[in-house]
């Protein structure tokens, strides 16, 4: 193989690697965007839960207890 063919082969291999890396990066970017949406949703749910706890007993000196949530039949 002469030098020109060797360079063409190396350039072709680099182009293939670059295309594969672009696909991987696009996939990772989509995954990061999906995880960001999930995190935003979880943060909103946590804020809502915290607000409900505060609204339920805003002047409480004691921390919130799950025992307060026991149904009356227990």
From Swiss-Prot:
InterPro entries cross-referenced by the UniProt entry: SlyX
Pfam families for this protein: SlyX
UniProt name for this protein: Protein SlyX homolog
Family: Belongs to the SlyX family.
Domain of life: Bacteria
Taxon lineage: Bacteria, Pseudomonadati, Pseudomonadota, Betaproteobacteria, Neisseriales
Organism field: Neisseria meningitidis serogroup A / serotype 4A (strain DSM 15465 / Z2491)
């Amino acid at each position: 193989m002469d030098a020109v063919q060797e360079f063409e082969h190396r350039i072709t291999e680099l182009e293939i690697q670059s295309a594969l890396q672009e696909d991987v990066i696009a996939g990772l970017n989509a995954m990061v965007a999906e995880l960001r949406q999930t995190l935003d949703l979880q943060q909103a749910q946590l804020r809502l839960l915290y607000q409900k706890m505060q609204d339920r007993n805003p002047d409480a000196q004691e921390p919130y207890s799950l025992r307060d949530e026991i149904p009356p039949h227990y």
